Amino acid sequence: MTEVRTRFAPSPSGFLHVGGARTALFNYLYAKAKKGKFLLRIEDTDQDRSTEASFKIILESLKWLGMEWDEGPGVGGPNGPYTQSERIHIYKEYTDKLIQEKKAYRCFCTAEELEGKKKQADAMGIPYIYDGKCSDLSDAEIGSQLEKKIPFTVRFKTPHKIVIVDDMIQGKVKFESKLIGDFIIVKSDGFPSYNYAVVIDDALMKITHVIRGVGHLSNTPRQILIFEAFGFPLPRFAHASEIVGTDGKKLSKRAGATSVLAFRDLGYSSETMRNYMALLGWTSPDGKEYMSDEELCSVFDVERCSKSPATFDVFKKLKEEEKESVDFNKLTILGLAEYLNPKSKLNWMSNKYIRDTKIETLGKALEPFLKDCQIPEAFKSGENPQLLSILDSVRVYLDRLIQAPPYIEEFFLENLSFENDEAKQLVLEGKGKEVVAEFYRIVKESSLTTPDAYKESMAKVGEITGEKGRTLFMPIRAITTGKSHGLELPILFSLLGQEKMVKRMEQLAGILGISLR
C-alpha cells in the first residue's frame, strides 16, 4: 500500500492566517490518520514579496500549533531542498525537457504588447487568452532573439481537451483547456510560476494527496496538464470550503483575518485552536465537537469535509461605521480582544479546555501572561502552589488564560484605595453604610471559606437591611475592592479569606471616615 504523503506549502510573504493554518492542519491530520508523512515546503519563487521575517513567523506559528513536519526546513529529508528558491536548477532541467519535446516554448512578447492585447479583449467583453504568437517561432528566430538578450518567458503549450478534476471534496469538476490558453511556466526572471513549480515539487517529493483551499481549484487543471506532460502520476486533490466571517463574507483584514499567533497572545491554547480549526468545514463521524488530538488524528478524513463555507465566528460582526476603519492586521492584542465574540465556539472550547486540563499544565501555560502582573515574583512561577490554588478556583470563569491575571492581582493587593468617586458613593449613598457594616460584622464573626458561604452571607445582609440587587452587592464590592466593577465576589472572597477581607474593609472605611461597628 502506497504511503500517504501530504504537504503544506506556504509563501513567506506575510503571517500565517487562519485559512492557511487550517490547510496545514487538514494535511497534518490526514497524514497522521493514515499513518503517513506530513511535509513542509516553502514556496518563495515570488522574490519581490518573500521575506526571511515571514518565513520565521510561519515556522513559529506551525510549531506553536503543534504541527511538527516529517520533512522540510530544519528537519531535512530525502526529497529536498524544501525551499523553492534552492530548486531553480531542478526546474530548469525539466523546462529544457519540455522545450525539447515541443510541449513548451519561449515567449518574447513584451509586457506592453501583452497589456495592449488584454485591454483589447476587455473592450470586446471577452476573457483574454494568449494568441500563441511565439508558439511557432523557428530555431533561427529564437536564436536571434536569444543572441540579442531579449527577455523571455516560457509558456506551456496547452493541448485542447476537457480536464476533469476528480476532487475528494468538490466531486468531479470539468474545465475546458482552450479557455486557459498557453500559460507562463517560467517568468522572465528565470523563476518558475506557482503552477509549474508546485507540480515538479509534488511529483519529486512523492506527494499523494494535495489538500488546500477551494480558491486553488481553478489552478488545478493547469497543474494536471503539466503532470500529464511529464508523465507524472496524479495525486488526489481535495479542495476545502471557503472560510467566511460572521458577516458571511470571505475572511479579510476587515473581517477577522489575523495571524494565528495573535490567538496565542490572546490566551488561547494551541490544543483549542487545533480543535476549533479542524471543525472549520469538517465534521466528525459521530458529530462530536470537543476532541483531543488523539481523537482528531484517529477519525479525520477529508471526504467528510463540506462544500459549504465554514463560519469563523471568533470575532463579532462589525458595525457599518467600523467596516472601513477596522483593520484586524493592525490591531493590538487589546484591540483584538474588544472585537472577540464572547459566544464563539472557540471560547466555548477554550473554557472547557481550561476547566478540564490538569492544573499543573495550566500553571505552566499561564507563565507568559504573568510577566507584567503586579504580584510578588515568587508567584509568577506556574509551579507555585498558592498560584495554582487561585487558578484552580477561578478557571471556570476563564475563556482565555490572559483573563487570569486580574483575579490573581486582586488577591495580592495590599494598599487599597477607591478607583473613583463613583465607587465611594456606592458606600455613602442610601443604605450603603448600613449594608457594609452588616457585611463586616458577619464576615468578622463567622468562619466563611467557600464561595457559597459568602453568597449566603450577602443574602443574609439583604434580609437584614431590606436591600437587594445593585444596592446590596455594589456597596459590598466597593468596600472590599475599592471598585465599582470587577470579579465574581464570592470567588474573590473565598480566595482572600477572612483576615484579608476584614483588613480590606477596615482600610477602605478609614479612607471614607466611616465606622463599621
UniProtKB/Swiss-Prot annotation:
InterPro entries: aa-tRNA-synth_I_cd-bd (IPR045462), aa-tRNA-synth_I_codon-bd_sub2 (IPR020751), aa-tRNA-synth_I_CS (IPR001412), aa_tRNA-synth_I_cd-bd_sf (IPR008925), Glu-tRNA-ligase_bac/mito (IPR004527), Glu/Gln-tRNA-synth (IPR000924), Glu/Gln-tRNA-synth_Ib_cat-dom (IPR020058), GluQ/Sye (IPR049940). One of its GO terms (biological process) is glutamyl-tRNA aminoacylation. GO terms for cellular component: cytosol. CDD domains: GluRS_core (cd00808). GO terms for molecular function: ATP binding; glutamate-tRNA ligase activity; tRNA binding; zinc ion binding. Binds 1 zinc ion per subunit. This is Glutamate--tRNA ligase. It comes from Leptospira biflexa serovar Patoc (strain Patoc 1 / ATCC 23582 / Paris). The lineage of its organism: Bacteria, Pseudomonadati, Spirochaetota, Spirochaetia, Leptospirales. The gene is gltX.
